[in-house]
A protein has these predicted regions:
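Amphipathic, hydrophobic secondary-structure cores in small proteins
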Residues: 64-71, 91, 95
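Solvent-exposed beta-strand sheet faces enriched in polar/charged residues
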Residues: 31, 55, 97-99
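Acidic-basic catalytic patches of nuclease active cores, encompassing PD-(D/E)XK
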Residues: 1-30
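Conserved catalytic cores of phosphodiester-cleaving nucleases, focusing on short active-site segments
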Residues: 20, 39-60, 65, 69, ...
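Short acidic/glycine-enriched loop/turn segments that link adjacent beta-strands
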Residues: 34-37
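Domain-level recognition of nuclease-like catalytic cores that cleave nucleotide substrates
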Residues: 86-107
Length: 107
């Protein structure tokens, strides 16, 4: 089960990356880690740093993917984004997005 969940998550991140790049985002990092925290995708627009949390679910789930982003996850993401900005000395506004994907049964 954990392996399948990881595979679905990684596939979702690949789709999200392609989606963002097609819309003019420059992807800087995928799965950037800070301690136990992780930023799924860090991307850049000309005047904005964008931190993207990617949530991918099997279509059989009852919950919507974005419902998995609770207050604790938001706090961890903000802490990791703060570390990212400090690590790379970035002086841009930061936008936080959730990209929600539902895997179809046909692939």
């Amino acid at each position: 089960m954990a392996k399948k969940k990881t595979e679905i998550g990684r596939a979702g991140e690949a789709v999200a990356r392609k989606y963002l790049e097609q819309r003019g985002y420059r992807v800087l990092h995928i799965n950037w880690r800070y301690g136990h925290y992780e930023l799924d995708i860090v991307a850049r627009l000309p005047d904005l740093l964008v931190v993207v949390e990617v949530k991918t679910r099997d279509q059989r789930r009852i919950m919507e993917p974005e419902d998995a982003v609770d207050k604790a996850k938001i706090r961890r993401t903000v802490a990791a984004a703060d570390a990212y900005v400090q690590t790379f000395d970035i002086d841009l506004p930061v936008q936080f997005d959730i990209l929600s994907l539902i895997k179809r049964s046909d692939g």
